[in-house]
Amino acid sequence: DLTSMLGAQQQTGTTTSTASSIDTSVCTSGDSANKYTQCRMVATAESLDAVWTEQLPAQAGLKYAKPEFVLWDGTQISSACGNASSAVGPFYCSGDRTVYLDMSFFSEMERSLGAADTPLAEEYIVAHEFGHHIQHLTGQMAKADRSGSGATSDSVRLELQADCYAGIWVNHASSTPDPDTGKPFLNRPSSEEIKGALGAAEAVGDDHIQERAKGHVDSDTWTHGSSEQRVRWFTTGMNSGSV
């Protein structure tokens, strides 16, 4: 559970905006973060900011610059990286340093991919996209050749590293305080909550998606990594807490 949250337009945090009818005006407290999915996403972004503001300088010697954060409902949306729809799902655009979170993806992840309907499973998705922002800040994204595919491609390596960064957030979130309240944003996850997050990582593995959609697996076309790889690297970050 999220214990506290900052306002959606807090000046010291990531600026959250919406590109649809999603209402963030109700996001005023920890209670609303635990009640409304959109508020939990805002609070998760604030927690990610707090964790990376501490950890990126401490571990990599780099200053953390906060991304923009846009909530949308799967309808058409424009970014510096082009137009997107629900077929794309959540994504990070380095061109405008923005995390675009398609809120409709969560029901798709649960209904079509078999992921658990748990808060930490959804928060993992946000943390993964913020992981791509970390890659942009460190220069790792610019160095990678994202044109290829396959289990050992740079595209897959970037995705697995973003999973690891998501795990690093889980490791530190329950001990990183909200600068306004002094209390951590996130209570220490239970074993069941962690199981749900691991299930989400497994559900978005390329092999799992291909098996459900086509009945067979083609590793040469992978762009995100297998279920086993994604779970392993998320777990690595969660256990180590180290970049």
Residue positions per predicted region:
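Long amphipathic alpha-helical segments used for membrane anchoring, targeting, substrate engagement
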Residues: 1-20
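Acidic helix-start/capping segments at beta-turn-to-alpha-helix junctions
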Residues: 28-37, 41-47, 57-80, 183-190
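Short helix/loop segments within enzyme catalytic domains
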Residues: 39-45, 49-51, 55-58, 161-207
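Active-site recognition of the HExxH zinc-binding catalytic motif
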Residues: 52, 101, 124-137, 159, ...
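Catalytic zinc-binding patch centered on the HExxH motif and its immediate surroundings
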Residues: 75-102
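Short pre-active-site segment immediately N-terminal to the catalytic Zn-binding motif
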Residues: 107-124, 150-156
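Catalytic Zn2+-binding segment of zinc metalloproteases
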Residues: 130-146, 168-169, 173-175
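Pan-zinc metallopeptidase signature
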Residues: 205-243
